[in-house]
Regions:
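Beta-hairpin "wing" of winged helix-turn-helix
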Residues: 61-74, 80
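Short, hydrophobic-biased segments on the C-terminal half of alpha helices
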Residues: 52-57
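Alpha-helical residues within the helix-turn-helix
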Residues: 37, 59-60
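Amphipathic alpha-helical dimerization/coiled-coil segments
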Residues: 90-107
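Basic, amphipathic "hinge/linker" alpha-helix immediately C-terminal to the N-terminal HTH DNA-binding motif
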Residues: 75-93
Length: 107
């Protein structure tokens, strides 16, 4: 298989997983750096150039809320799930469980 084809398919597969992982991890409020580090520590590394546009998009869709706060003498933007985000996360978690079970049977 062509390496470019594999890379494109791999990125497509990861995209949906990243959305679910970010939403799940923002059940508790975090700022971008701590979110990125936590996901990496759990085995899901994500580039800043991917994370921050994703956070902005999820916020514009009403799934996240954010606010600027000073911490350690620096301004940081903290993110958390909105009410709609929490409902969407529940739906996506259920969808993930079904897909995961199906894929485990298929593979």
């Amino acid at each position: 298989m062509d390496a470019d084809i594999f890379q494109n398919l791999r990125l497509e597969l990861r995209r949906g997983c990243l959305i679910l992982a970010v939403l799940a991890h923002l059940k508790t409020e975090q700022y971008g750096y701590t979110l990125r580090k936590a996901l990496a520590d759990l085995g899901l590394a994500i580039d800043e150039s991917t994370l921050y546009p994703l956070l902005r998009r999820l916020e514009s869709q009403g799934l996240l809320v954010s606010e600027w706060r000073e911490q350690d003498k620096r301004n940081k933007r903290f993110y958390r799930l909105s009410r709609d985000g929490a409902e969407t996360l529940q739906q996506l978690e259920a969808e993930w469980q079904g897909l995961n079970a199906s894929m485990n049977r298929i593979l």
